[in-house]
């Protein structure tokens, strides 16, 4: 059933200064035509009220207990539950459960699956507590499931008021009777854990034109801690703490030092004002001394060194912050990359562990970057213990030029956010990574900062065919113990078990179990959907489960990936019980049922012609790569925003005039109207060419800079040209 929300929504709108709900069509990512309607109120204000729109299944709504602060601190001693993003504050995905071992892992089967209506790039790590599972979805929705059966208990859909770059969400926090989620449009929302009803909803980011949230919500004692993304849009990295009780802002720490602060001298002129250093991925906390470890990312503009050459502190660094007091205090930092012009984030979430070095136990922290460097440091002072290269490296020290320069790995390669895990039984750290090269080009060496637009100095390169590798590193020596090649990028992290297994995945949708000591493969499962989310483990009534969320490849889409079967929660166990399959509404369906959303509507073929020239197509391709590709994909297949070609686009049944209205009225999403009329026309010419609409008038008529009735006669079917845009 659907929870009644009319009066609640009206009350909320009144509180934020609006007398009544807007008289507009339903706004949704999949309803491209709806986006062209004139929106009469602030979508951001409306988004603040969406938390009350709860869809519940039968049996939901009873009061629930949630982990206490002490439960979270003791997470490493509780293997029945999984209460933090990476199980513990240390960030090491390790379980002491022993039911699944090398002798029976080959018998793992799908215990249950649940469809996710909010299809997209799923990066969430589910939270499991006392038989219930809580997870976020690609566009910041929240679901509560029965962890034994996958039955939907309640879900709260969410449509961000805007998506700056990436519509992904890495997970919820659970404490104080609440489920917490940080959203792409900079909101921090607390929901009732038993019902999904909104409790409070506050503004999080200090700058909304160039920042967003994709990090999981971390709960530490009485604080909710979360960092902003937006390093590709010229923000200043920000990590903040909020009260779990009412959302009150408790403290902020910025990664880019301002005038008078230590490190400011590493930024020439005013380059610090849009220096980036976003903290988008995740954190680890040494709960013994209240030290938070965070990795500010690349400096901005991403691809251009001119005007900011130097160390650019504290970008591309591991920073240790003392958070015991009312304001964070930096204890030490270690910078992995200087003079970065390839978006070489230290993307891996830090992992804290006690390892043996020269046969002596030491408190260590491990990190990794997109350049393929894996680094182990002393946790107390930041001293480097070992640095190991896990991927092919070439050209990373050569700045991009206008003609282009090869670099390996590219911005989608190396070690990504989920990182790896430490096995205490073997003193091995196991980390997956991606081998992928690209040509990096700049279009200008003096990029202008425009709020809401990318701040790159060029276009992030198109993704190439890519493969993965799992590397096991000896903590004592830094040497490689074993490697396993993967057919697709390895970005789902690692789960290590007390029985000597290392579970991992690839973006092609394969799950693997390897021997942690030797790399021998024991199990492989083809899921049918891309995996960029990590694996979690838990136990109910003596039955051990492994769970992972699968979906679209999104920003990790490479040309060699297979098609996907939509978004699902997949949970595995031993035994031969029939698989329980749940659809997105909570109904039990046949196992491996096709995605019900896949057949919605019927794609059509493009028809008619449209005015545009090849000069406009070339100009539009350059603008699209710079301003649109991060959301809609370099091949127009969609990432965090809808596809602009192919069957799903064909189902929208748009004509060229409607497409023009949508693009001109709503793009870029946080800086509408900032392109010039001829630039909008060029982008539209590129889209029409890509979708096989032939040029009118022998290609000599330019796409108009104003609306034209003739555009209504051209229907767009999303029929992607086999050879790309028309020549």
Task: Give the location of each predicted region.
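Short loop/turn segments that connect beta-strands within beta-propeller blades
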Residues: 146-149, 192-195, 244-246, 323-326, ...
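Blade/loop signatures of beta-propeller domains
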Residues: 61-110, 255-262, 459-460, 466
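Extracellular/periplasmic ectodomains of large secreted or surface enzymes and adhesion receptors
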Residues: 63-69, 73, 383, 387-412, ...
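Extracytoplasmic beta-rich repeat domains
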Residues: 114-125, 155-176, 201-216, 233, ...
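Flexible coil segments in periplasmic/lumen-exposed cytochrome c-class electron-transfer proteins
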Residues: 597-610, 614, 621, 625-626, ...
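Gly/Gly-Pro-rich "capping" loops immediately C-terminal to redox-active cysteine motifs
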Residues: 617, 621, 633-668
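Short coil/turn segments that connect the beta-strands within blades of beta-propeller domains
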Residues: 79-80, 130-131, 176-177, 221-223, ...
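Beta-propeller blade signature
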Residues: 237-248, 311-325, 468-474, 565-575
């Amino acid at each position: 059933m659907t929870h009644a929300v009319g009066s609640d929504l009206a009350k909320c709108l009144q509180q934020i200064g609006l007398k009544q709900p807007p008289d507009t069509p339903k706004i949704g990512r999949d309803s491209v035509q709806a986006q062209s309607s004139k929106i009469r109120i602030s979508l951001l204000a409306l988004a603040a009220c969406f938390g009350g729109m709860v869809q519940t299944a039968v049996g939901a709504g009873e009061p629930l207990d949630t982990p206490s602060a002490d439960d979270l601190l003791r997470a490493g001693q509780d293997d029945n539950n999984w209460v933090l993003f990476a199980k513990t504050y240390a960030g090491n995905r390790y379980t002491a459960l022993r039911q699944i071992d090398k002798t029976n892992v080959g018998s793992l089967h799908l215990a249950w699956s649940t469809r996710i209506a909010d299809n997209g790039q799923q990066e969430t790590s589910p939270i499991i507590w006392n038989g219930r599972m809580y997870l976020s979805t690609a566009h910041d929705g929240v679901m509560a499931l029965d962890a034994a059966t996958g039955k939907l208990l309640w879900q709260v859909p969410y449509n961000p008021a805007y998506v700056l770059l990436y519509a992904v969400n890495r997970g919820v926090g659970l404490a104080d009777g609440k489920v917490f989620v940080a959203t792409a449009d900079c909101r921090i929302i607390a929901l009732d854990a038993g019902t999904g009803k909104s409790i409070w909803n506050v503004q999080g980011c200090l700058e909304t034109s160039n920042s967003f949230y994709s990090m999981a919500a971390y709960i530490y004692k009485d604080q909710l801690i979360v960092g902003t993304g937006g390093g590709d849009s010229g923000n200043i990295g920000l990590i903040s703490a909020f009260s779990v009780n009412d959302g009150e802002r408790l403290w902020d720490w910025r990664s880019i030092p301002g005038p008078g602060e230590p490190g400011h001298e590493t930024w020439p002129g005013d380059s610090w004002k849009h220096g980036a250093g976003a903290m988008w991925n995740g954190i680890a906390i040494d709960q013994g001394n209240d030290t938070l470890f965070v990795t500010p990312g690349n400096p901005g503009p991403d691809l251009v060194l001119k005007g900011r050459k130097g160390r650019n502190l504290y970008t591309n660094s591991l920073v240790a912050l003392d958070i015991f007091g009312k304001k964070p205090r930096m204890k030490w930092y270690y910078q992995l990359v200087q003079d970065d012009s390839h978006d070489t984030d230290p993307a891996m979430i830090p992992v804290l562990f006690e390892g043996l070095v020269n046969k002596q136990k030491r408190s260590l922290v491990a990190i990794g970057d997109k350049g393929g460097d894996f680094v182990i440091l002393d946790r107390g002072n930041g001293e480097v213990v070992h640095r190991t290269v896990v991927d092919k490296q070439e050209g990373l020290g050569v700045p991009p030029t206008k003609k282009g320069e090869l670099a390996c790995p590219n911005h989608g390669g190396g070690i990504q956010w989920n990182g790896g895990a430490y096995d205490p039984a073997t003193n091995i750290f196991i980390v997956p990574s991606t081998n992928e090269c690209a040509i990096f080009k700049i279009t200008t060496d003096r990029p202008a900062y425009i709020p809401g637009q990318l701040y790159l100095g060029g276009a992030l390169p198109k993704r190439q065919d890519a493969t993965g590798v799992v590397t096991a590193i000896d903590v004592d020596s830094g040497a490689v113990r074993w490697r396993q090649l993967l057919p697709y990028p390895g970005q789902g992290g690692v789960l290590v078990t007390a029985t000597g297994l290392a579970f991992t995945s690839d973006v092609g949708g394969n799950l693997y179990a390897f021997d942690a000591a030797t790399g021998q493969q024991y199990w492989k499962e083809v899921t049918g959907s891309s995996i960029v989310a990590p694996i979690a483990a838990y136990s109910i009534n003596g039955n051990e489960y492994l769970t992972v969320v699968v979906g679209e490849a999104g920003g990790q889409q490479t040309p060699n990936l297979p098609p996907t079967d939509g978004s699902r929660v997949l949970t595995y166990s031993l035994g031969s019980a029939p698989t329980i399959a749940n659809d997105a509404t909570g109904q039990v369906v046949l196992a491996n049922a096709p995605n019900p959303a896949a057949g919605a509507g019927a794609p059509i073929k493009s028809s008619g012609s449209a005015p545009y020239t090849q000069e406009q197509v070339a100009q539009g391709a350059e603008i699209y790569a710079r301003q649109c590709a991060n959301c809609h994909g370099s091949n127009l297949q969609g990432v965090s925003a809808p596809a602009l070609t192919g069957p799903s686009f064909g189902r929208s049944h748009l004509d060229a005039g409607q497409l023009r209205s949508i693009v001109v009225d709503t793009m870029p999403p946080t800086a509408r109207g900032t392109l010039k009329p001829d630039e909008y026309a060029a982008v539209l010419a590129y889209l029409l060419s890509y979708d096989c609409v032939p040029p009118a008038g022998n290609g000599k008529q330019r796409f108009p800079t104003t609306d034209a009735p003739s555009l209504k006669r051209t229907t767009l079917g999303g029929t992607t040209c086999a050879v790309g845009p028309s020549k």
